[in-house]
Amino acid sequence: KKQIMLVGGRFSGFLAEYLAAHLRLLRPGISVVGHDELSRATAVADANRQTVLVVFDYRRYTVWAEHLAQTVQAQGATVCLMTDVWLSPIARTSSVVLPCPVESPSPFDSITAATAVVESLIAAVTEQLGEHGKRRVALAEGILRDA
């Protein structure tokens, strides 16, 4: 079974955490790569052909995220990129690229469209896993309720 690692930037890290929280309920093998050097180093050490790295990289692209993506890909991992319409440099080598608009009337980019893409991914994974995923969610929710 694939190991899924997720990583995001200053603001998009929220999206990585949000997707990871849902995926953890649905299946094992989910981790979020922290922004610190140790987290990135151990992510690289753990990466192999069974790894999928989901990178959230939007305008003001993150240099360390690009390096992380290139390094794990060199070890056989698959890279899936969530980015804006201008495309992060990581797009050049990613197996999957999911761009979305980020324009906003404020000085900050909007994550509204990106959140919708994440919600769609959660729905697709839930459907793909079928009853197994639903049973796992029910079990986890039961454990959380009883805690």
Regions found by a protein language model. Give the residues of each.
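Context-gated lysine
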Residues: 1-2, 134
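Glycine-rich phosphate-binding loops that contact phosphosugars or nucleotide phosphates
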Residues: 2-116, 123-127
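Internal, active-site/partner-interface "lid" segment
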Residues: 128-147
